[in-house]
């Protein structure tokens, strides 16, 4: 089998590339996905409110676990990643958050990455998006990904939480992806107008999968990339339960889009990575690239949970006897409780003046429950997810075996810097202050978690050690740049090799301020033009907010 391009991984970036590259009818593409199809009849991945379900099994989730995390009481922590067409966009929380403009401007300060500035990237965010209220300087009106805005009157807790943030002295913003990210406001979601999850399988592949020049193989577990000298010339994979490898050749390029955990694994198995690590497993060295699998970053978050004194939370939706009605409303009308992910309000703040742009993110949820659906509080409640955004802690992903089915060693080194502890202490104390504003007086009952007895630095630190969880935002393991630990250049081409690019969240040099999915899709769109040799879209001229030393919050 021969193709122009072979794409490994049908996730948030891979599906963008598959769709854009096959717009040219003369270009042939093979898209390999280790998981299965995105079954449209499966409410677990299609109903926004069911977002906890795909994380519970292994049909749609790789369900990786970390090594014991040394600064988290040696907990082995969850590291869920999407499996199936759509990748992590098939199982994520559907928050459409792009990050802060200064994240990208910060990338662009690296020599060779100048064209990754916010204004260079904004046209690609717009190209990918159809926002339900129409386009403007910041948002697209005819892209493949449906974005739904929060509508007034959904739940009084959303507005009360935003108002509480404002009463605490923080800014209000109408659009967390618009002129000003900093502040509290409604949150956009990747949900279709019919109340379905807008994964990249739905948005992109639906328009491309019938093209004769696109071949999609599911249940295709990539074993390794085939090289001829320093040139990538094909891919070998295992189909289904078969132990006999299948191979295909790429006339132009192999495009690795397997995500921040799997992309470095595949490179390492293929002979690209730290020579020392590869020697351990007798893998013939193709190219010594010490940065492969290093620079691993993530967002850590914790929940502050409160009783709700009024019966306005989503608690009744957790009762089995209410679920048939909710399911029917969603199935037949695309409306009701099932049609939202219920992360409809949030915010970004600076916890201290020394941060030039926000370093803390909030998601509000009108029910008290763990992200994966466990430990639901048996009463009306609400919670606030809070976490730091640009931790200095760095980890790694390293293979433990040549067997593609064997999970790698994943270590994030969460909370390994004093800055991490300071940010979380600040975040908990600021959150309590926000929660005690007048806007929440009629709703706020007792603090369920961490609980009012948890006050000193030592008590807060111990709570974080035992209860902070991943926000499922791993990135950075094949970072873009030109220093000795960089893996790819500014166009995603792997240093020292030919015919091989990495296009996914692993190339982010530094994690962004917010959820990763929207930016991963943008990276796919921008790289698709680079791969095709097309001129970049014209730079945006939109304005954007920079704090420039303004106070963190207004004096009361």
Curated annotation (Swiss-Prot):
Keywords: FAD, Flavoprotein, NAD, Oxidoreductase. InterPro entries: BetA (IPR011533), FAD/NAD-bd_sf (IPR036188), GMC_OxRdtase (IPR012132), GMC_OxRdtase_N (IPR000172), GMC_OxRtase_C (IPR007867). Its EC number is 1.1.99.1, 1.2.1.8. GO terms for cellular component: membrane. Pfam families: GMC_oxred_C, GMC_oxred_N. FAD binds at residues 4-33. Coiled coil: none annotated. GO terms for molecular function: betaine-aldehyde dehydrogenase (NAD+) activity; choline dehydrogenase activity; flavin adenine dinucleotide binding. It comes from the Bacteria. Gene3D superfamilies: FAD/NAD(P)-binding domain, Glucose Oxidase, domain 3. Pathway: Amine and polyamine biosynthesis; betaine biosynthesis via choline pathway; betaine aldehyde from choline (cytochrome c reductase route): step 1/1. Its cofactor is FAD. It catalyses: choline + A = betaine aldehyde + AH2; betaine aldehyde + NAD(+) + H2O = glycine betaine + NADH + 2 H(+). The active site is at residue 473. One of its GO terms (biological process) is glycine betaine biosynthetic process from choline. PANTHER family: CHOLINE DEHYDROGENASE, MITOCHONDRIAL (PTHR11552:SF147), GLUCOSE-METHANOL-CHOLINE GMC OXIDOREDUCTASE (PTHR11552). Belongs to the GMC oxidoreductase family. Involved in the biosynthesis of the osmoprotectant glycine betaine. Catalyzes the oxidation of choline to betaine aldehyde and betaine aldehyde to glycine betaine at the same rate. This is Oxygen-dependent choline dehydrogenase.
């Amino acid at each position: 089998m021969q193709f122009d391009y072979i794409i490994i991984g049908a996730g948030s970036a891979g599906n963008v590339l598959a769709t854009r590259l096959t717009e040219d009818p003369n270009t042939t593409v093979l898209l390999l996905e280790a998981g299965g199809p995105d079954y449209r009849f499966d409410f677990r991945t299609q109903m926004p409110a069911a977002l906890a379900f795909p994380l519970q099994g292994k049909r749609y989730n790789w369900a990786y676990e970390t090594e014991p995390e040394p600064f988290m009481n040696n907990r082995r922590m969850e590291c869920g990643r999407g499996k199936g067409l759509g990748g992590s966009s098939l199982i994520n929380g559907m928050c459409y958050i792009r990050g802060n403009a200064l994240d990208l401007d910060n990338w662009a300060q690296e020599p060779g990455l100048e064209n990754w500035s916010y204004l260079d990237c904004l046209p690609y965010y717009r190209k990918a998006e159809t926002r339900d209220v129409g386009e403007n300087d910041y948002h697209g009106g005819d892209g493949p990904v449906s974005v739904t805005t929060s509508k007034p009157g959904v739940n009084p807790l959303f507005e009360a939480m935003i108002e509480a943030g404002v009463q605490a002295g923080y800014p209000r913003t109408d659009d967390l992806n618009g002129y000003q990210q900093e502040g509290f406001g409604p949150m956009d979601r990747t949900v279709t107008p019919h109340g379905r999850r807008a994964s990249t399988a739905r948005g992109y592949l639906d328009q491309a999968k019938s093209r004769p020049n696109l071949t999609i193989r599911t249940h295709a577990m990539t074993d390794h990339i085939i090289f001829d000298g320093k040139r990538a010339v094909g891919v070998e994979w295992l189909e289904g339960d078969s132990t006999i490898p299948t191979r295909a050749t790429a006339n132009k390029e192999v495009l690795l889009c397997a995500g921040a955990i799997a992309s470095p694994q595949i490179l390492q198995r293929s002979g690209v990575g730290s020579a020392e690590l590869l020697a351990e497993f007798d893998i013939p060295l193709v190219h010594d690239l010490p940065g492969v699998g290093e620079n691993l970053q993530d967002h850590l978050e914790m929940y502050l949970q409160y009783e709700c004194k009024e019966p306005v939370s989503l608690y009744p939706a957790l009762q089995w006897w209410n679920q048939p009605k909710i399911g029917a409303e969603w199935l037949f009308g695309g409306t009701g409780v099932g049609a939202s992910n219920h992360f409809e309000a949030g915010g970004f703040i600076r916890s201290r003046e020394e941060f030039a742009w926000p370093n803390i993110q909030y998601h509000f949820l009108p029910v008290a429950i763990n992200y994966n659906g466990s430990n639901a509080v048996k009463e009306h409640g609400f919670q606030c997810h809070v976490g730091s955004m640009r931790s200095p802690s760095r980890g790694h992903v390293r293979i433990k075996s040549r067997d593609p089915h064997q999970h790698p060693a994943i270590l994030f080194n969460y909370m390994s810097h004093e800055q991490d502890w300071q940010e979380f202490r600040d975040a908990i104390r600021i959150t309590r202050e926000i929660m005690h504003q007048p806007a929440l007086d009629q709703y706020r009952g007792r603090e369920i978690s961490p609980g009012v007895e948890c006050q000193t630095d030592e008590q807060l630190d111990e709570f974080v050690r035992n209860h902070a969880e991943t926000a499922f935002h791993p990135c950075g393991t094949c970072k873009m740049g030109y220093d000795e630990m960089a893996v790819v250049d500014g166009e995603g081409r792997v240093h020292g090799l030919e015919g091989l690019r990495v296009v996914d969240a692993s190339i982010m040099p530094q994690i962004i301020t917010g959820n990763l999915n929207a930016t991963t899709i943008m990276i796919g769109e921008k790289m698709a033009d680079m791969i095709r040799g097309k001129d970049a879209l014209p730079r945006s001229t939109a304005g954007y907010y920079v704090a420039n030393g303004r106070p963190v919050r207004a004096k009361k």
